[in-house]
Amino acid sequence: MKKGIHPEFDLVVFEDMAGNQFLTRSTKIPKETTTFEGKEYPVIKVAVSSKSHPFYTGEQRFVDTAGRVDKFNKKFNLGKK
């Protein structure tokens, strides 16, 4: 491989919104850091991961879409006439 043309590929911690963390490698190196297994690593925050996604956990979660629609209609005065 040629030197100087490839991005750095370092260890980072990915953390989902549920607080689950896992260590992997990435070319994206953020400034924010966290401690994982006693060492300091850069951290990338993600919404969901394989530890929290319903497909991988087998949990069913109900999303309140009806409440969201009502909130939208109320916000823009689109209620029933």
Swiss-Prot record:
NCBIfam families per UniProt? L31, PRK01678.1
Concerning Pfam families, the annotation shows: Ribosomal_L31
Q: Source organism's superkingdom?
A: Bacteria
Q: What the protein does?
A: Binds the 23S rRNA.
Entry-linked SUPFAM superfamilies: L28p-like
Could you tell me which InterPro entries the record lists for this protein? Ribosomal_bL28/bL31-like_sf, Ribosomal_bL31, Ribosomal_bL31_B, Ribosomal_bL31_sf
Do the record's keywords include Cell membrane? no
Entry's Gene Ontology molecular function annotations? rRNA binding; structural constituent of ribosome
Record carries keyword Ribonucleoprotein: yes
| Assembly and oligomerization | Part of the 50S ribosomal subunit.
Q: Which GO terms describe its biological process?
A: translation
Q: Which GO terms describe its cellular component?
A: ribonucleoprotein complex; ribosome
The alphabetical list of record keywords is: Ribonucleoprotein, Ribosomal protein, RNA-binding, rRNA-binding
Q: Could you tell me which PANTHER family the record lists for this protein? A: 50S RIBOSOMAL PROTEIN L31, CHLOROPLASTIC (PTHR33280), LARGE RIBOSOMAL SUBUNIT PROTEIN BL31C (PTHR33280:SF1)
Q: What is this protein called?
A: Large ribosomal subunit protein bL31
Family (UniProt): Belongs to the bacterial ribosomal protein bL31 family. Type A subfamily.
